Curated annotation (Swiss-Prot):
Subcellular location: Membrane
The protein's name: Tetraspanin-13
Membrane topology: Multi-pass membrane protein
Keyword flag Phosphoprotein: yes
Species for this entry: Mus musculus (Mouse)
Residues with the Phosphoserine modification: 143
Lineage: Eukaryota, Metazoa, Chordata, Craniata, Vertebrata
Transmembrane region(s): 20-40, 45-65, 73-93, 168-188
GO MF annotation list: calcium channel regulator activity
Amino acid sequence: MVCGGFSCSKNCLCALNLLYTLVSLLLIGIAAWGIGFGLISSLRVVGVVIAVGIFLFLIALVGLIGAVKHHQVLLFFYMIILLLVFIVQFSVSCACLALNREQQGQLLEVGWNNTASARNDIQRNLNCCGFRSYNPNDTCPASCAKSTQKCSSCAPIIGEYAGEVLRFVGGIGLFFSFTEILGVWLTYRYRNQKDPRANPSAFL
């Protein structure tokens, strides 16, 4: 059967949702791995990653069930939710790619000041103290603070990687944004196709 028929649309939609399922399980696994190995101690960061993973898993599950059963209501809600996710993700991805170094620094400083546990993780893993300057009276978990070695500030070290990370996140986000708009198009098309095995007198 040529691609574009009922079976092809169904198989493509199932494959797309299986991909989303794998990505969601990967996100949850990475968060659990980070906590298990002590790389991340911020429950807020881990909670956000796990919440995104669960949300993506539920969306994929709805899409998969709707595709397998050709369920009109599930497919409709799946299409609407996927469209909303596309709009948000596309906007965030474009923002990540558009940030200049000054804006990146301001964003990093806001995050630094509002996440104490993540701040401690960064200082410990990168062996630096303070964002732009280090106050010896402040508590710092970095090894340099416990020795005679001079501690450098974290802003220059984080800044080296921030641009690359934002470009990577923006690129990955754009890729998945286009898979989501593909999913919306496939779902719309699949909903309006008639199952060849169904009763010929039935409506779709």
